[in-house]
């Protein structure tokens, strides 16, 4: 039986084939043999000779076409590029563009998903986008419906509008309801953006404050270094000057005595003469000390105040115990000198807000002063003008408590708690000389270079040479006014000046530049003098009250008066360029390149922007609490490079940005 089964299987594979078929899947050797015969037959037809007529012609035609197509260069390049393509690229090339974009947007790496911040919002980003997009589509559809409705009403107003179908109304209602729901999403989006912007602004403000504090510290350190450098330079200059002069001074003491005797005899002769009693010819004796103007080396100017908003307070100091009569400073955050009716003249460091000393020598209150670099000029009610050199200052401790104990009161143990407002020092060695020629109080002064002009209640102006310390010219204001009146009578024209006010200073303000001098007096006239000839070159008529302040530049002259007005004059034409007024008399005024500031009998400083003509207030009175004590009236103002100083009636001095 076994032999018969082997004979039935010609290939002899039946001996190793299991009854269930090859590999247990039902595939027998007979199936494999049949598949092999079919493959052999097909290959024979395809690969057989072309001349064999037994093969089908369509096979040969197909192979010839394929062979011809493969020989083309374009086809060969495509085949070569296909062989260099990775399997991943082959798979991607079978995807459409839309499918690729969908996969790129829908599949994100885990690293990006892990960095998504947590959000407490109840809506998603897609909902917000959809709310914005739907609103745009709604507006377009609303415009289309509105235009169509207008056209129908225009064409058939007589027929009347038919009621819409319920279905259309429901659709409209659903659309409006959906849009109303989306409004909440959009409102939440706007609210979130506002909160985010507020947080960013708060962070920026904090960062700005930190940088401003850093800038303030740098400027304080810079001021200290420059002060130390200036002191060393001054000491070196003094040593170099005294070294060659020491033997000469020691060898000629007798000659000095002779010179001193000659000055004494000359003064005695002048006193014995009639002209010595005249206020026009009285000259002071030569000062033993000469004025040496040492320019302060300023390598960089302070810029801290430029980063504050206009009207911001920088510092406030209780400078005096009575009304401030005069203040001036050299540059922002530099040195300030203040005078008041408490008969003191104080020097301040504006960078730290501390009094560095006193200028003592006047016998009465100081009415006017000017600070230029390290030189200070003060004019007092004792009819004298004194010059001070702050670079020579040497501080000496003194008692300067404001609230001193009365005699008879015992000093308790808490004397250290007494309110001491100032640094208890006095400045010695900074006094240079005194200019004594006026016979009444000095109410105005101005110096530039080696020339100083002073105005007094004795109705004269005096020109001083600061190198020699002598008066070189006296200008009689009354004589000039009389000459103008005589000339006016001859030409049938009379100036419209008024009679001087008894309560006002006869010489209210003055300023000089080279040979030009502008002087404002109590008759409301502004006279322009030529110092070379000693004559009035021009008179500006317009004010109806005493002139209290003035200042000029290359083009304009600005004057303030007790008639409550400030006038801007064009010096080229001699006419009024602009004018404005306040509610009360003007007591002080100054301007820089951008603004004009004035004290007008109120607790604020009046500011006028020259560019746009805008008026605004600056000072402690702006936004002051009405229930509390009101700030004192501003009496004096000074302005340089946007840095404003105000002196009040209660002795307070404050610095502001302007």
Swiss-Prot record:
Coiled coil region boundaries: 209-246
UniProt membrane topology term: Peripheral membrane protein
Start-end of each WD repeat: 319-360, 361-398, 437-476, 482-539, 542-581, 583-618, 629-658
Domain of life (superkingdom): Eukaryota
Compositionally skewed regions (Basic residues) per UniProt: 139-151
Keywords: Coiled coil, Membrane, Mitochondrion, Mitochondrion outer membrane, Repeat, WD repeat
Entry annotated with the keyword Secreted: no
GO terms for cellular component: mitochondrial outer membrane; transferase complex
SUPFAM superfamilies: WD40 repeat-like
Compartments where located: Mitochondrion outer membrane
Keyword set includes Lipid metabolism: no
PANTHER family according to UniProt: WD REPEAT DOMAIN 5B, WD40 REPEAT PROTEIN
Record's function text: Involved in mitochondrial fission. Acts as an adapter protein required to form mitochondrial fission complexes. Formation of these complexes is required to promote constriction and fission of the mitochondrial compartment at a late step in mitochondrial division.
Family statement: Belongs to the WD repeat MDV1/CAF4 family.
Name of the molecule in the record: Mitochondrial division protein 1
Organism expressing this protein natively: Neosartorya fischeri (strain ATCC 1020 / DSM 3700 / CBS 544.65 / FGSC A1164 / JCM 1740 / NRRL 181 / WB 181) (Aspergillus fischerianus)
